[in-house]
């Protein structure tokens, strides 16, 4: 297998608090890898370190061998590590299609402001970006809401739009931040299918943080488990379900069920 992303002995300290402590793992190209752990385990902090929204105290993160930690987040995104957010990248006054078109600015010759101000370079890109947006809409099954304002969308459609925005940037590794949060069972299973299709049909490597353990166990090739900022386990879903350290970490927590 080809390694696409490496997390090497990454540590993050906030004053006297160590939020992430000497965490290492690799993500193989074309893999779906989940990061789980009880509340406060350091999952969100780790995601921010990988996407460079936080700087590492020590250690490094590498994309295809190139060190990317502590670069500006937009540079990391341009290199191919793209993080989806829980609505913060969505322009609520724009339609679904317009949001996807605007998100192409990460790989455009024009700036984002160029799209708003109508620069010549932006106009030259507009047609191809429109076609790409339509392809993404078709791929994710968003045709029925393509012209709906983002502000009117229910939770499941907002999650799908967030995924579409990430996909529009042509990522090598897509970081999904709680993609199943707030969804019912049917919506979750639909999103699980979409994530699999991203990998199988688009060749996107997926790294996700999620609390929905049944969904994690269903979708993941491998799982990394954090507790108190440290990696305590790594393996297949079956190996994680039967790992005594993982079971002990979850016992007595709000996340006690680990999806067996």
What are the residue ranges of the model-derived segments?
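Glycine-rich phosphate-binding loops of nucleotide-dependent enzymes
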Residues: 1-260
